Structure formats: C-alpha cells, structure tokens
Amino acid sequence: MRRRDFLKSLAGGLVLIPALRMPLACGNGRPLRFGVVTDVHFARREMAINRYYTEALDKLRAAVEQFNAARLDFVIELGDLKDMGPSGDPAESLRFLDEIESALQGFRGPVWHVLGNHDCDCISKAEFWAHTDGCEKELLHHVAGCYSFRAQGFRCIVLDADFNADGTDYERGNFHWTSAWLPDWELEWLDRELDSAAGEPTLVFVHQMLDHFSDVSSQLVVRNAPDAVAILERHPKVLAVFQGHHHPGFYSARAGIHYVTFPGIIEGSWPAHTAYAIVEVHPGGSIRIEGFGDCPDREFRGKA
C-alpha cells in the first residue's frame, strides 16, 4: 500500500506519531503481527559468494505473497534492500532499487524501511528515500533514517547506523562496512523516544547489530553499540531489538532484551533457499517468530 492510500484508510490500526501530528494508535488486546525481511541485495548481476542477486526478486515476491495471506499490521525490511552492479553505476543501482521496491510495495498494508550499508553503496540516503515509498517518509529527520511509530499499542523505534565516526552520512561508498556509528544526536533522540514511550512495550529495529556483548564478530556490530545498549537497558519496556546485516542470523539476550538477527534472504538459490518471518508480539511481552525457509522459528515467553 502506498503511503497516500494508507493515510486514507487508517482503520487498519496503525498510526504514525513522532511529530504528534496524528492521533495515537490504541491496542485492542490482540497481538501485534508483522512481516520481516532483510538483506535482499537485489541486483541484476551474477551470483557471488552464495548471493543470488537476481533471484532475490522472486524470493521477495513469494514472501510478499505469504505476508498478504496473513493478518499483518505491517511489513518491515531491515536494510540492504538493493545492491549495485560490478561497475558501481548509480543510475543502474537506482533501477535495481525501483524494481525491488515495486515488489515490496505489493504488500497490501503499511511498509517500513530500515537503512542498510548497501543502500548507500553508490547512492545517497536522499536518493534512496526518493526511490522508495514507505510510510516513514514524513517522519524522517532530514535524510537520516531514524523514526518511530505506534502499532497496536506498541512503540516501534527504527535506528539508522549508516554514519561514519565523524557523524557524516554514508553516501556513495564513502564508508567501510565495518565502521557503523550512531551519532550523538541520534542516541539523544533514542533516549527521548524511550522516555516518551512511558509504559508502552517497545520494539527496536536496526540493520547493523547492537549486541556487542555477544560472541558475534565485532566487525558486524555498531561501533558505539555499548552507548545504545546502555540507553535501552535503562528503559524496562524495551522487549526486543530486531536486526539484519549478519546473513546467517543470530540470537543473544541481556538485561531482559532479546536481540534477534534475521537471516538474509539473498543467501542460496531459489526456490531451495529463502528467509523471512512473521513476528507476533503479545502485550504481555511474549514473542513468537514463525520462520520461513532458512529462518528458524523462535518463541520467547516474556522478557529475556
């Protein structure tokens, strides 16, 4: 569903909030249900290191078909929606983005995006947002991809770690993929958002990983993740952090917070391989993840 159509049909129960320009969504006791897909990496190029770039389009279309058959409040993709060709041509990469975004928008409901590092490999954040049509467009802080919204009585917070150490945006490959940062202003914004969430159960979405305390490679983790995690742990209503970036997937937990890294849909040849999930979160804090393809099922009966 396009943003303009969604705003005409708010009866679905999801309402955007950060600038408080719209009424707030109220939960009705039923669980929040949403679809998750990450690391699509669509491009029209040859397979490399088990990444089947072109086949990612069919994988995503099949995932969207499954999402449409379920009763979902929204779908969120956790970054690296597109990739680029061997030449790194920006115009070509934008064509890839247009094609894969069209498939994602086949979902008949709200669609949200998270910025990944490959989304800025040869284009800018501004160009990425100009070629996507998610519900987040009116909520963005300039071109930075951090925003929040409410759905079914839950606060959902999306972070953007596509920044260099000096606070500059990732843009046209001016970065190294192992150096992802959350700038000070975004950490302050996160703290304010969590304060304003008050008693609302809260979910956090980000592309690069935050669970620095785990045994995952530090190359995959946001460099100042300890600062972000410290903020999350000060707010007891944070239930989970949902991440991408690490294509095999991963799980860890600390201080009552689940850190779930979903496997990348790009890995392996279609139709033998795919990976996406439907997540169900109950008001009491229990979480059920129904995985498809190479994505495992998970069930958490409350905070970690």
Predicted region positions:
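Short acidic, glycine/proline-rich loop/turn micro-motifs
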Residues: 45-49, 86-87, 168-173, 214-216
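Conserved acidic residues
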Residues: 73-75, 202, 239
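Short acidic, glycine-rich surface-loop motifs adjacent to enzyme active sites
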Residues: 197-213
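Active-site glycine-centered loops adjacent to acidic/histidine catalytic or metal-binding residues
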Residues: 39, 79-80, 116-117, 207, ...
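Extended active-site neighborhood of metal-dependent phosphoesterases/phosphodiesterases
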Residues: 87-201, 227-238, 248, 252-291, ...
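N-terminal secretory signal peptides
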Residues: 1-2
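N-terminal active-site segment of His-dependent metallophosphoesterases
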Residues: 24-91, 144, 192
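N-terminal export signals
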Residues: 5-25
